[in-house]
């Protein structure tokens, strides 16, 4: 029997504790879970991709079946096929997230009908945490330690030094 392989994607700019919770939960559903950091052309970059990847790898190092990958110019479905993933994992905080994700699910299914999408609902303590909210707090010099993993906080501090 073949391994169950999933792909959880996002821009993770920056990764939040909500993302980490989703990754931890999704890792229990699969033999192998890839976490794909994708460039989002609709969002202005905050942290360079290398910093995001390094911080995310440190944040998930306790999960033996999780591997972090990145992509600049590929469709999620194509990356899933290349990695052997048969399931895309998406996180939902609210109805707006579902509506946003449903359109991608439609196209993904049209491009590859053998790749399914599953949705994990945010835990109540993470419902209102978002990367854009964290970026806004940082813009005004606020402490974000309770919203992001320590490794991400380190990457942000290191990036500010440069």
Curated annotation (Swiss-Prot):
Sequence positions that bind substrate: 11, 43, 76, 90
Family matches, as Pfam families: CTP_transf_like (PF01467)
GO MF annotations, alphabetized: ATP binding; pantetheine-phosphate adenylyltransferase activity
UniProt keyword Nucleotide-binding, yes or no: yes
Cofactor: Mg(2+)
Principal location class: cytoplasm
UniProt pathway: Cofactor biosynthesis; coenzyme A biosynthesis; CoA from (R)-pantothenate: step 4/5
Functional description taken from the UniProt entry: Reversibly transfers an adenylyl group from ATP to 4'-phosphopantetheine, yielding dephospho-CoA (dPCoA) and pyrophosphate.
Similarity comment: family membership: Belongs to the bacterial CoaD family.
Protein name: Phosphopantetheine adenylyltransferase
Organism: Streptococcus pneumoniae (strain ATCC 700669 / Spain 23F-1)
Lineage of the organism: Bacteria, Bacillati, Bacillota, Bacilli, Lactobacillales
Chain's gene name: coaD
């Amino acid at each position: 029997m073949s391994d169950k392989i999933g792909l959880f994607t996002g821009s993770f700019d920056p990764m939040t504790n909500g993302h980490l919770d989703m990754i931890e939960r999704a890792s229990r559903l699969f033999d192998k879970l890839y976490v794909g950091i994708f460039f989002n052309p609709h969002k202005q970059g905050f942290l360079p991709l290398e910093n995001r990847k390094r911080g995310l790898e440190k944040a998930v190092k306790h999960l033996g079946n999780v591997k972090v990958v990145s992509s600049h110019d590929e469709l999620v479905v194509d990356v899933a096929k290349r990695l052997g993933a048969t399931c895309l994992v998406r996180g939902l905080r609210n109805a707006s997230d579902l509506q946003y994700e449903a359109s991608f699910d439609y196209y993904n299914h049209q491009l590859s009908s053998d790749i399914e999408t599953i949705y994990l609902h945010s835990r109540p303590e993470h419902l209102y945490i978002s990367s854009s909210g964290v970026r806004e707090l940082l813009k005004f010099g606020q402490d974000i330690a309770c919203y992001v993993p320590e490794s991400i906080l380190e990457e942000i501090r290191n990036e500010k030094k440069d």
